[in-house]
Amino acid sequence: NLFNPAIGRLIDLWGFQVGESERRRVPPERAKIEALVKTRPSMDDIQIDGILLHGGNPDLKLDFGYIARGYAIDLAIDRLRDLGIHNALVNIGGDLRAIGTRGGPPWPVALRNPIGGGVLAILQVSGDESVFTSGDYQLNFTYKGKTYHHVIDPRTGWPAEGTRLVTVIHQDATGAAAAANALMIAGPDLWQQTAQAMGVRSCLLIDALGRIHMDPSMAGRIELLDRNAEIIPIPSPAPGDDSLSPGS
């Protein structure tokens, strides 16, 4: 599972969760990373006994930091609905969930360009939708010419490679946050299968070469502002085609 909240000790080892002044500026020792990866902590190691959780793996530590923002947004939307508010947008650090409309028109959402900054594209959001982005520019440090970012691949223990940015559209914000993290790790080769397995139908991925990969749903909704961007569209599957199904 590419979204794995059980790798809290790996997250701690990299130290991105602390304040910037305390954040490490060099990668952890390779031996320490490999030792944690070798034990493969996962959610399957947890047994639930009433209100108690038991972990069968000594290297298991839960860290829900990747989805905390999404969960907070979902709680805020639920509270607004309880108050009778049916048109709203809740935004935390650029990740958001919108319900209803902006007084009639959809909510315009700007997507950041990870290469050089600025605005990459505009999305129109309405109804009940969340837009979440995961990128290598959000938390990182550079050591000996190589940039290390905060999205840790549980399979290797190192920052995910091959992807600069992922943006997903999903209904609930918690699911969108988990999907953005998982697709960032999946990379250009596995993002379609991962999105389908997680029930996400609208995705955009920018690979390490700056190329934009989009599924048909996202391509039909997005307004790209960078006219020179190289786009790699994904064709719609033919009826009955299950070639992108997980395990195929």
Predicted region positions:
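Mature catalytic core of soluble alpha/beta enzymes
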Residues: 1-248
